[in-house]
Amino acid sequence: FFDRLLAIKDAYFRDGRFQMQFSLHSTDEEARRRLIPARTWDLRQIAEFGDRFYRKGDRRITLNFAPAEGQPLEPSRLVPLFSPDRFMIKLTPINPTLAAGRSGLTGLIDPADEGSCRAIAEEFEAHGFETLLSIGELRENLIGSNCGMFVAEMTGISR
């Protein structure tokens, strides 16, 4: 799949017209397996593919983190694998969905506390990574439309 995606990107979406993102959520492999209980690449595999995927003129590949309390988040662990010239960081809050509530996760990105958000971003920036704080429309939390999970559960729709 990913080799085909690379061929499509190179053929039709050159020069920054394609955005690739990997959701990592932690810099620790064991924590990632707990947070993402599905078959995933490890950090080294993501880095190796990213190095093959990136071409001069492309957008940087995004490494997305929705960091949670108690989960390792050490930007220094990324440096040996991910070049800041090819990879950037996106920090997002954990949306207050029913699934997030059941998991017991408490997000470190609090949209109401810009100072703490900036502090986390600055840790990545200190290692040379361009870092984007991606805070969505907070009204979505009030009506339960984020990720569609709340609406699906309230209506009995399952995947």
Give the location of each predicted region.
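Conserved SAM/AdoMet-binding glycine-rich loop
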Residues: 1-72, 88-91
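Auxiliary Fe-S-binding modules of radical SAM enzymes
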Residues: 48-60, 65-159
